[in-house]
């Protein structure tokens, strides 16, 4: 659920694009300067939607807020039942398949939730973002980002994983409407 207490209105800007950092924070504190460069280079605001973990302390949360100026920053406790709305009751057998299955499930939940977060932040700022970038907080960007893109294309990072076998869900981006369409069919 969207929470007003996670909105950081003091960080609202006129930026045209938005970066979603979704997933566990892990090593983000070592990547803050790179994320900041990305935000500046792409004229992007930032939404962070992460999970609680045993590794991240309050100092790291404050450092992220100070260095990256997110417009929305939420930290959720993972709740398997919150994913039932997306997957349905018949898919509860995922609990039997261990961490990988739960990780995928939580990732799809965050993808779906991100649409709602973007819409709420857009509403609060009375604007619509042009390009939406999605990544994990613990990843470094290697791609040269092209901001002059087609309305009908989604671009996937090609430096992570075996590009011949699969497409990375770790970093991708596209214009707002195609991004929303893509996430809705996941």
Report each predicted region and the residues it spans.
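ER/Golgi luminal nucleotide-sugar-dependent glycosyltransferases, focusing on the catalytic module
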Residues: 1-186
């Amino acid at each position: 659920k969207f929470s007003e207490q996670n909105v950081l209105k003091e960080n609202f800007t006129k930026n045209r694009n938005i970066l979603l950092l979704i997933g566990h924070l892990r090593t983000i504190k070592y990547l803050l300067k790179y994320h900041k460069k990305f935000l500046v280079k792409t004229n992007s605001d930032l939404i962070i939607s992460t999970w609680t973990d045993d590794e991240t302390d309050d100092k790291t949360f404050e450092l992220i807020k100070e260095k990256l100026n997110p417009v929305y920053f939420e930290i959720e406790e993972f709740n398997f039942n919150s994913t039932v709305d997306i997957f349905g009751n018949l898919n509860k057998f995922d609990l039997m398949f261990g961490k990988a299955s739960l990780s995928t499930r939580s990732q799809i939940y965050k993808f779906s939730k991100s649409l709602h977060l973007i819409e709420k932040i857009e509403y609060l700022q009375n604007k619509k973002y042009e390009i939406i970038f999605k990544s994990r907080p613990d990843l470094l960007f290697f791609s040269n980002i092209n901001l002059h893109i087609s309305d009908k294309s989604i671009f996937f990072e090609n430096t992570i994983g075996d590009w011949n076998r699969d497409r990375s869900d770790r970093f991708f981006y596209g214009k707002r409407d195609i991004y929303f369409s893509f996430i809705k069919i996941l």
